[in-house]
Design a protein with these regions (language model features):
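Short hydrophobic beta-strand that contains or immediately precedes a catalytic carboxylate
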Residues: 11-15
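Conserved SGNH/GDSL esterase-like catalytic core that processes O-acyl groups on lipids
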Residues: 20-222
Length: 222
């Protein structure tokens, strides 16, 4: 069965402001993880003006310019063409960074064992990843149009930091996923979205990230 598979059972919950800030999905995640194991808060955007409302993960970001798919016409063409189903894309200035930290708002949020960061780096870039404010490593990223993933694992992932050291031009930040073996629930809420925004996302970006994560169930709430 899926629960015995060597990877998490992954659920994507796509909705509007009804689930914004992890409302409803926080309770669903807690119940499923308590019943079937798993941990972590799932997907969290690289940067968003709404992060302060979400209590299941603490996000601190600086140096990013973030665009929402509902206001996609305000985004530069390069970003406008590369939206993911999360509805957010972030463009960094040199030295832009984000730090995510687990909370105790719900059970098992601190049982995260793997974290993954997703981004686009069409040009050569250099990024820094810091695990639990202690283990730091720099990565040289060769320019390519494919979605990139950096994954880290530990007995307990309490925090993760990501920084763009160089190559910020055309770089696109999507966010990070925090998970543990068992059930993962990713909240993809977009305010004022009636479902039509999915047609404004990039099918290739969606397919590439799905190939890396592998969703078993997609819930649509509009």
């Amino acid at each position: 069965t899926l629960l015995n598979a060597p990877r998490p059972v992954r659920i994507a919950f796509l909705g509007d402001s009804f689930v914004e800030g992890d409302i409803l999905t926080a309770d669903l995640r807690e119940r499923l993880q308590s019943a079937y194991s798993g941990g972590g808060a799932g997907f969290a955007p690289m940067a968003s003006p709404l992060t302060a409302f979400r209590r299941t993960v603490k996000t601190q970001s600086k140096g990013w310019t973030t665009y929402n798919i509902m206001q996609r016409k305000a985004a530069p063409a390069r970003l406008r063409e590369n939206f993911y189903v999360s509805g957010w894309v972030s463009q960094p200035a040199a030295g832009a960074s984000t730090r995510w930290e687990s909370t105790d708002y719900r059970k098992r949020l601190d049982s995260c064992t793997t974290a993954r960061v997703f981004f686009l780096s069409p040009r050569d870039s250099r990024v820094e990843v810091t695990l639990n404010d202690a283990q730091r490593r720099e990565f040289d990223i060769a320019g390519d149009d494919a979605v990139r993933q950096i994954a880290v694992s530990a007995p307990r992932v309490r925090s993760l930091a990501f920084k763009v050291l160089s190559g910020a031009e055309d770089f696109v930040g999507y966010g990070a996923v925090f998970e543990g073996r068992g059930v993962v629930v990713d909240n993809y809420s977009v305010r004022s979205n009636n479902g039509q925004a999915m047609f404004w996302t990039n099918p290739s970006v969606n397919a590439q990230i799905n190939a890396m994560l592998g969703y078993d169930l997609v819930v649509l709430q509009y």
